Amino acid sequence: MQNPSTVTQESAAPVFDFFPRLRGLTSRNRSPCSNSDGYALSSSNALYFNGFRTLPSRRMGKTLASLSFNTKSSAGSSLRRFISDFNSFIRFHCDKVVPESFASVGGVGLSSDENGIRENGTGGVLGEEGLPLNGVEADRPKKVLILMSDTGGGHRASAEAIRAAFNQEFGDEYQVFITDLWTDHTPWPFNQLPRSYNFLVKHGTLWKMTYYGTSPRIVHQSNFAATSTFIAREIAQGLMKYQPDIIISVHPLMQHVPLRVLRSKGLLKKIVFTTVITDLSTCHPTWFHKLVTRCYCPSTEVAKRAQKAGLETSQIKVYGLPVRPSFVKPVRPKVELRRELGMDENLPAVLLMGGGEGMGPIEATARALADALYDKNLGEAVGQVLIICGRNKKLQSKLSSLDWKIPVQVKGFITKMEECMGACDCIITKAGPGTIAEAMIRGLPIILNGYIAGQEAGNVPYVVENGCGKFSKSPKEISKIVADWFGPASKELEIMSQNALRLAKPEAVFKIVHDMHELVRKKNSLPQLSCTA
């Protein structure tokens, strides 16, 4: 294969071709061609639309697709021609935008100044900052890159839990980085993902249209392919900035584009790519990608969805949802925790949460609880409330200023949630998967007071049908349930607590990181999955 022409950064259409270095890393045949500018191209140096790729064959000059159209109509032919043309555009564009940092250890060497690739004297390849790419030096700390986005608090919480588990289990053997790939490494409007999510969630109809409208494979695959044409270079730079040995996605939008980039440069054998799903039951189809090394599912329900999406059994592990390692530590006595939090040491307590942003009917529920947990005949409280307002300082200030008839503690953003849960007897929260998993580990019966359509909808029957809690959107009904649990229905509270403990998986995060450690250790012998995106 002839080396591509040297192109300076000032060129209007820079092209970076590393196939001399990538020879031997992939089993697919490559055939160079030329575009109208005279640059050397390669059929595999592209991000493919819905799994399409052009095969250089004298007999077959047509574009083949993993997705077949079972129609001979003119409409079907037109659609196939459109997709073929669009795929050619993606291939032409992406050959010019994937950055120099994507260099892999290969069988054919280049001079030290070709395409910005430098060697370290031992046959390894150095990246932009002179650091060896993954797999080059066995003595260096292995690097883990966790991809997340602040669309809700659960993704960051899972990322932090995984990082803490790596640090606790392996110490300096791993360096763990967390990045919001879209916000930190892509241009406008792609870097507005968290803001867009928050807007859509606040407008339920728009969110439902977005969630269910993008569920079909042909829709979201087409969307990712089109998006790749604009941000492939930025995504590649964002990934290789860290020179990762492991890439972990804890967000449904953090695998398709990165995997396309890695595949286009032949790095799927070099980097272990895993997905840690953070939805307990229902989850968006974008969570699943056939090219991942491993897909960690929190429940058998999610594992079944993964298999239906085409993942092999060997790719799927069901360990549970990763929660902070601090939740695995022995529970301190309730009296001690309540004393530290300024709570009454003897009264039963309910934990009222609204997520990291303090959303939901917290004030209305708190007022209803204050009435229900006050015995007018005795003139005293029969329960107490611990309210977590998250980052909602306005709500925290308002609730703190009220005169309550029962003991009420109002807190802002909390980092030691395990202590707050350990001090209480039950919890009221929206159906966020992370909070549910943490509550189960602490054996707290759960009252769900809301959910986000789509990904959180399945969490409600998951809790209710497993006998771990109840669901109601009515503050008055919720307060009655709590009052009954603290009184005549105390036996039900105890049974639900036992059910929650039975369903809990506190060791999930440790099982996940140890499995990843084994994947890295064996990565040179792992077979590469041969399938389309």
UniProtKB/Swiss-Prot annotation:
One Pfam family named in its UniProt record: MGDG_synth
One annotated GO molecular function: UDP-glycosyltransferase activity
Inducers of expression: Induced by illumination and cytokinin treatment in etiolated seedlings. Not induced by phosphate deprivation.
EC class name: transferase
GO cellular component annotations of the record: chloroplast envelope; chloroplast inner membrane; plasma membrane; plastid
Main location: plastid
Positions bound to UDP: H155, R324, F413, I414, G434, T435, I436, A437, E438, E456
EC numbers on record: 2.4.1.46
UniProt catalytic activity: a 1,2-diacyl-sn-glycerol + UDP-alpha-D-galactose = a 1,2-diacyl-3-O-(beta-D-galactosyl)-sn-glycerol + UDP + H(+); 1,2-di-(9Z,12Z-octadecadienoyl)-sn-glycerol + UDP-alpha-D-galactose = 1,2-di-(9Z,12Z-octadecadienoyl)-3-beta-D-galactosyl-sn-glycerol + UDP + H(+); 1-(9Z-octadecenoyl)-2-hexadecanoyl-sn-glycerol + UDP-alpha-D-galactose = 1-(9Z-octadecenoyl)-2-hexadecanoyl-3-beta-D-galactosyl-sn-glycerol + UDP + H(+); 1,2-di-(9Z-octadecenoyl)-sn-glycerol + UDP-alpha-D-galactose = 1,2-di-(9Z-octadecenoyl)-3-beta-D-galactosyl-sn-glycerol + UDP + H(+)
Effect of D279N: Reduces catalytic activity 50-fold
Residues involved in a 1,2-diacyl-sn-glycero-3-phospho-(1'-sn-glycerol) binding: H155, P189
Subcellular location: Plastid, Chloroplast inner membrane
Regulation of catalytic or functional activity: Activated by phosphatidate (PA) and phosphatidylglycerol (PG). Inhibited by galvestine-1.
Tissue expression summary: Expressed in roots, stems, leaves, flowers, siliques and seeds.
Result for mutant: D279E: Reduces catalytic activity 25-fold
Effect of mutating P189A: Reduces enzyme activation by phosphatidylglycerol (PG) 2-fold
PANTHER family given in the database record: MONOGALACTOSYLDIACYLGLYCEROL SYNTHASE, MONOGALACTOSYLDIACYLGLYCEROL SYNTHASE 1, CHLOROPLASTIC
Function of the molecule: Involved in the synthesis of the major structural component of photosynthetic membranes. Required for proper thylakoid membrane biogenesis. Does not discriminate between prokaryotic (18:1/16:0) or eukaryotic (18:2/18:2) 1,2-diacylglycerol species, but operates with some preference for the prokaryotic one. Is responsible for most galactolipid synthesis in chloroplasts. Required for the formation of thylakoid membranes and functional photosynthetic electron transport during cotyledons greening in young seedlings.
Subunit-level organization: Homodimer.
Family: Belongs to the glycosyltransferase 28 family.
Stated name of the protein: Monogalactosyldiacylglycerol synthase 1, chloroplastic
Higher taxonomy: Eukaryota, Viridiplantae, Streptophyta, Embryophyta, Tracheophyta
Gene that specifies this protein: MGD1
